[in-house]
Amino acid sequence: MAVSSFQCPTIFSSSSISGFQCRSDPDLVGSPVGGSSRRRVHASAGISSSFTGDAGLSSRILRFPPNFVRQLSIKARRNCSNIGVAQIVAAKWSNNPSSALPSAAAAAATSSASAVSSAASAAAASSAAAAPVAAAPPVVLKSVDEEVVVAEEGIREKIGSVQLTDSKHSFLSSDGSLTVHAGERLGRGIVTDAITTPVVNTSAYFFKKTAELIDFKEKRSVSFEYGRYGNPTTVVLEDKISALEGAESTLVMASGMCASTVMLLALVPAGGHIVTTTDCYRKTRIFMENFLPKLGITVTVIDPADIAGLEAAVNEFKVSLFFTESPTNPFLRCVDIELVSKICHKRGTLVCIDGTFATPLNQKALALGADLVVHSATKYIGGHNDVLAGCICGSLKLVSEIRNLHHVLGGTLNPNAAYLIIRGMKTLHLRVQQQNSTAFRMAEILEAHPKVSHVYYPGLPSHPEHELAKRQMTGFGGVVSFEIDGDIETTIKFVDSLKIPYIAPSFGGCESIVDQPAIMSYWDLPQEERLKYGIKDNLVRFSFGVEDFEDVKADILQALEAI
């Protein structure tokens, strides 16, 4: 049967494009995110940002690799994850309008039309009948082994000559569903038919002809080019995180510190000024206090609740960025994100919130007014203590600036690590629910225990920002910090008496983790220096995993009885 009788099914929706939209240049990143109003923070600018180039787009072209149907039937059913490179890398979305197709290609299409099997055409026609859509007949280019399907798409929103649906995840009403399906549910089936996202292990991507390369360089088409600039597996992860944060764009990197440092270097000019808070991750503080001054960048440090101090700083200095955690590490202080964003934006200051302790489920910093959100994806987002990663979420413009520098500095996330995070995120909502619950219940128990002198947890009324946390968070997190009623030796005995948690420097995973910050993070400093940061020898930070609450409770209580 002739190719012209083929009708393209609805799998070519606008939602399907972003999952494997090739993005190697910084201005080709990001896409609109659907969902509730809380998540649609930057949607207006993002819709048109997914497609760039000088020519108007009247169609989209998917290029299948040689013998695609045969490969799919033989390999995909047997081992979808190993199809990866050949089929995904070969799938390129072209910006060339259909009218620009060369006459030679048109002739090739005509000559090869009869080679398409009637069975394939019938199956396609059946799919089209089940889900009708305004479609143009496909065009086959070059040979029977390389099909290029050109399809007009359902009209909901039209920008120029590109037709897009107005809501990418309109059928997903909760963050829990987004953690499972965002970035994956739509679109990938046209490449592998695999439920899970394939891992694309390649360092570079090839162009079949020099003309393709020139089209790419002159932005008439988009494609992956080099592994440091983008990867199909990594793009799926970025889209999933963007959906949760309500961001136009997300950039993933090799670690949380990589994300923080590249963000600071990209957005704060030499001679600029930063405002941060007293309580924060020590390595972040070291970078700001020891390395940024070499670029002439100065830092003002304020208490997380010191709004007057923030106003004084932005009025006195030309502040480029306000950067803090919320909740903070290790005392879980909370910053009024909405208020500080209003104060900073009046003076042209950007706001970046490290939301690692909150997760995108417990707090939507972009919806509260922040310009950027940083996460150590090593923690809750990955959630299994088996991968290092970091991410930056925000507007397309800001993330693109950071991506530009990232392409130069490196720190690229390995696609295997990206896959582990994608898989881990499918249970993020379940894990966080359990961790929120266990942490809250244990915080109440610890606060009432005679051998605990103080508990730091935003879910407790005794916390200085408890009312603020109730306003801007939907859950209080899975980490509780507390002080044992005793000295460092007593605290060590408590920690060593625990049987369930690991003594380790991380948090947010399925396994419970405990540490003494005075030893784990500040042991190189004398006690008087540690006290400047509020780090007492009897301070304990406990990250609750997903173990049964009663087991964890019994373990902590027996350890307290042992001291």
Swiss-Prot record:
It is an enzyme of class 2 (transferase). Its cofactor is pyridoxal 5'-phosphate. One of its GO terms (biological process) is methionine biosynthetic process. It holds the Pfam family Cys_Met_Meta_PP. One of its GO terms (cellular component) is chloroplast stroma. PROSITE patterns: CYS_MET_METAB_PP (PS00868). InterPro entries: CGS1/2, Cys/Met-Metab_PyrdxlP-dep_enz, Cys_met_metab_PP, PyrdxlP-dep_Trfase, PyrdxlP-dep_Trfase_major, PyrdxlP-dep_Trfase_small. Pathway: Amino-acid biosynthesis; L-methionine biosynthesis via de novo pathway; L-cystathionine from O-succinyl-L-homoserine: step 1/1. Its main location: plastid. A DNA region of the first exon coding for a conserved motif of 11 amino acids in CGS1 (positions 77-87) is required for post-transcriptional autoregulation and acts in cis to down-regulate its own mRNA stability in response to excess methionine. This conserved motif is dispensable for CGS enzymatic activity and only found in plant CGSs. It is unclear whether the transit peptide cleavage site is between Phe-68 and Val-69 or Ala-90 and Ala-91. This is Cystathionine gamma-synthase 1, chloroplastic. It comes from Arabidopsis thaliana.
